[in-house]
Amino acid sequence: MIIPIRCFTCGSLIGDKWEPFITRVSNGEDPGKVLDDLGVKRYCCRRMLLSHVDIIKEVIHYTRPI
């Protein structure tokens, strides 16, 4: 869905790191190196970015009108 603003486990701010992360990984950089450069050290925060699946464009087709 939408990338969370904070880590579910420790509460660290991770939402601001999503765009630089996805841009650099799309350009072929190693995800682990990118996370190190962005300062994401905790494994709980790293998994939030590494395991996120952006499916908002698929889900939005199934919303009901208000």
Curated annotation (Swiss-Prot):
Q: Which reaction does it catalyse?
A: RNA(n) + a ribonucleoside 5'-triphosphate = RNA(n+1) + diphosphate
Where would you find this protein in the cell? Cytoplasm
Q: State the Gene Ontology terms under molecular function.
A: DNA binding; DNA-directed RNA polymerase activity; zinc ion binding
Swiss-Prot/TrEMBL keywords: Cytoplasm, DNA-directed RNA polymerase, Metal-binding, Nucleotidyltransferase, Transcription, Transferase, Zinc
The record ties this protein, via Pfam families, to: RNA_pol_N
Q: How is the cofactor bound?
A: Binds 1 zinc ion.
| A cellular component annotation (GO) from this entry | cytoplasm
UniProt xrefs under InterPro entries:
RNA_pol_su_RPB10, RNA_pol_suN_Zn-BS, RPABC5/Rpb10
Q: Which domain of life is it from?
A: Archaea
What does the entry give for GO biological process?
Answer: DNA-templated transcription
| Record PROSITE patterns | RNA_POL_N_8KD
Binding-site positions, Zn(2+): C7, C10, C44, C45
Matching Gene3D superfamilies = Homeodomain-like
Q: What class of enzyme is it?
A: transferase
Q: What is its EC number?
A: 2.7.7.6
Q: Supply the NCBIfam families for this chain.
A: PRK04016.1
Q: Which family does it belong to?
A: Belongs to the archaeal Rpo10/eukaryotic RPB10 RNA polymerase subunit family.
As for what it does, the entry says:
DNA-dependent RNA polymerase (RNAP) catalyzes the transcription of DNA into RNA using the four ribonucleoside triphosphates as substrates.
Its assembly, as annotated, is: Part of the RNA polymerase complex.
Q: What is this protein called?
A: DNA-directed RNA polymerase subunit Rpo10
> What gene does the UniProt entry assign to this protein?
rpo10
